[in-house]
Amino acid sequence: MNDKLNYKLLNIPDQLGEEAIKTLSQEPEIKNTLEFIQKTDILVFGIGKAEEMAKRRRIPEDKVNEILSKGAVGEAFGHYFNEEGEIVYKLNTVGIDLETFKNIKESIAIFAGKRKVDALIAMTNINKNIVLVTDEENGYKILEELN
C-alpha cells in the first residue's frame, strides 16, 4: 500500500537517548524514511492535549507537572506548546520536527474531542497552513472559541 500511496511510516519509540537516536538514524531504512520526511509535500497528523499525551508517553509525574506549569495545552511531534504556540518542552524523538512541519505544503490535522480545542487553536499559532478534518460539533466549538 505504501508504494501505491507513496507514504512512509516511522515506527520508533517516542523517547530515546541521544546515542540510541544517533544509532537508529543511521540504519538504512530509517535513514531513508528520515530523508523522505524532509521532502514530503503532505502530512497527516494528530494533535493531542498536553496532559493526556504526556501520560500516554509515560512521562514521569513530576515532569508532567513541570510541563503543565509552563502552560502547555497541546502536543504534536513530541513538542509541548502553550496557547501562543510557544514550545515549552520537547521530547527526544526521531522523525518530523516543527521546522519541517512549518515547511510542508499541505498539513492535514485529524482532530476529535472538544477537550482538545485549545490545543488545536494553539497549533495554528505554530503553523496557520493547516487543513482540519473534524466533526460538526468540534467545528462549532472552534468557531465559538475564535469569536
Label each region the model flagged.
Residues M1-N147:
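Conserved phosphate- and dinucleotide-binding cores of soluble alpha/beta proteins
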